[in-house]
Amino acid sequence: LAFPQESYVNRSEATRDAILSWFQSIPEKVAENVRQEVTVSVPAQEPDHVRLASLGRRTESPITVMEVTAEIGGTLYLRGQDYDGYDGMTWTVSQHRTEDFSLTGEDYGEVSIRTVGERALLYLPYYPARSMALIGGNMSNTWSYTEYVIPRAGLPDDWRITAISGTATPPDLNSPYLALPDATRARAEVLLADILGGASSTVEKAEKIGDYVRASARYDLNPSRMGEGETDFALWFLESAEAGYCVHFATAAAVLLRAAGIEARYVSGYLVKTAPGTPADVTEKNAHAWAEYYEPTLGAWLVLEATPSDMAAAQQPTPETV
């Protein structure tokens, strides 16, 4: 993604065998739903750390990374990697975490994704009441696909581990998705006393948090770096910073959600807008970050978009012309 390179640390290969073993257990007929180009090289690994303290200017490469075609069209969040560990300065991925990930979103019909070169992950849109198993927070591109199609019904049945909303277990108070440094939680709870007002449901609280974070600073691709002596990136951004981009806003939202007792995580991927049936070139300009939060009534994770609408123009893909 087109965020400062020094902010990311590449994933180790500690879980490669586990990922490969899991994928090999899926019936071979999944391949019928995927068009592939055979390759012998190994995709580069996605980062498993996001170092927030070093964030500075965000670059926007015009290089195309994938082509996306949606049958129905609309705004697509293409989910890549989620991060659950937060220590005030860094987001990290649980290397050995395996879970059923409930995908809840819009119906885009069939979505075709063709990558330019290999990608370490399969970038996937959100669908209503869909789930898949994630290892280490992502769907690893073990087969090195550079072209794949997600059918109208959503993910192929063989990738669907569960697809029934409302059956997930309640949040665990020891969940990594609620974990925060003690000092961070205490300061965040002070802010929440004014933010939440009369909100009672999970969705109402999330909406109020999103409104607050979006209004906390302006959108700018060249914000000031966090100053020396600061101990928490999210709180520095909310209390002192004047500007930031999606990484800043998504981090602040995820931290406030956790402090409010709502399981949350930081997610990176791409945000693109497509016209029905029209291929669109996606560049690193479309790289994006957002927060996900767990809604226990649905038994699913929902997107919380906390970045101001100023960034919308920066997320427009380039339609192909004939």
Indicate residue ranges for each PLM-predicted region.
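Helix-boundary/low-complexity linker signature
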Residues: 1-322
